[in-house]
UniProtKB/Swiss-Prot annotation:
This is Small ribosomal subunit protein uS19. InterPro entries: Ribosomal_uS19, Ribosomal_uS19_CS, Ribosomal_uS19_euk/arc, Ribosomal_uS19_SF. GO terms for biological process: ribosomal small subunit assembly; translation. It comes from Sulfurisphaera tokodaii (strain DSM 16993 / JCM 10545 / NBRC 100140 / 7) (Sulfolobus tokodaii). One of its GO terms (molecular function) is structural constituent of ribosome. It holds the Pfam family Ribosomal_S19. The gene is rps19.
Length: 140
């Protein structure tokens, strides 16, 4: 079972290349298309954790398990064309954040889609929290 490519993905272009061209392109040529930070990172090679994740990804693609979610802590893995269509759950320090990789994510890091901080929402200040609250009627 191969990945069914939705029509909107067929219109996608990354640096002038279609998704089909990217999937059939050798890794060396793909690396030349990436921005400098990602290009330099991939030229160094993959770390052991990244290599294990890539092997797992290739196994899932070979077996056609596109609906199964891949859980990982590897936030610094660059999204490659072969990852398009797969579901990932990336750890943000507290929980796993799930998302499906779409072509627009190619060249970004997995960690960019699993935000580690959330917006602080303060409640109402308590009694004596501010100087003006001394003059408010007592709650109760």
């Amino acid at each position: 079972m191969s990945l069914e490519i939705p029509p909107e993905w067929k219109k996608f272009r990354y640096r002038g290349k279609s998704l089909d061209e990217l999937l059939n392109m050798p890794m060396d040529e793909f690396i030349k298309l990436l921005p400098s930070r990602q290009r330099r990172s991939l030229k160094k090679g993959f770390s052991d954790k990244q290599r294990r994740l890539l092997e797992k990804i290739r196994k899932y693609v070979r077996e056609g398990k596109y609906s199964k979610t891949i859980k990982t802590h590897v936030r610094d893995m660059i999204i490659l064309p072969e990852m398009v269509g797969l579901k990932f759950a990336v750890y943000n320090g507290k929980e796993f954040v799930e998302f499906q990789v779409v072509p627009e994510m190619i060249g970004h890091y997995l960690g960019e889609f699993s935000i580690t901080t959330k917006k602080v929402e303060h409640g109402e200040p308590g009694l004596k929290a501010t100087r003006s609250s001394l003059f408010l009627a007592m709650k109760g």
